[in-house]
């Protein structure tokens, strides 16, 4: 089966600066706080927390760090007041961009996100201006190594996955949001580890950008990734072949 994820071309550009700056654990920690606040610290009954923990493990967050984050979240609930705010807009060449934030100061986050759009050659738009170009999907990325493609495909599809794609170095499993946990847990039960596992916004189509616009857009992504309020950035840019900055 063939998918439309283009994971290496699209998602890898977004996430590498998080890892480089050591911010990804902090961002996931905020998601843990919100998951615990909304559903409690027991993973057996809190599906959202299970999903966030899976995302943390895929990002190589140590188990001890995850446990401490959950424990810390349980003790901080009365003082936690993060607000989930989603911004939409356009990058160079009309690239569609969605920015998800968890913030305790929406004026700060709005100003920072708007600045990143402007400095990256784009502009922030109104709510709904680009979200119709995306679909919410679960996405599980698995490194190929020596894994049996047919076996993995059957496990994923039997558990309810919508699609199974073979890309250059990875397999990408796509699910409906409500089936994400079931499919992920079916793969985990077989000892499969993930490069990435989360529910995200996946574009219906992609916009090819040239090298000049790629440089501008990468600046926007770097600024957004470096913002503590920004949790996720989704876009439909297709970078030039071989682009890696």
UniProtKB/Swiss-Prot annotation:
GO cellular component: cytosol
Span of the signal peptide: none
Single annotated GO MF: DNA binding
Localization in the cell: Cytoplasm
Alphabetically ordered keywords of this record: Cytoplasm, DNA-binding, Transcription, Transcription regulation
Principal localisation: cytoplasm
GO biological process: regulation of DNA-templated transcription
InterPro entries linked to this entry: Integrase-like_N (IPR017856), TACO1_YebC-like_2nd/3rd_dom (IPR048300), TACO1_YebC_N (IPR049083), Transcrip_reg_TACO1-like (IPR002876), Transcrip_reg_TACO1-like_dom3 (IPR026564), YebC-like (IPR029072)
Name the UniProt record assigns to this protein: Probable transcriptional regulatory protein Cbei_4222
Species the sequence originates in: Clostridium beijerinckii (strain ATCC 51743 / NCIMB 8052)
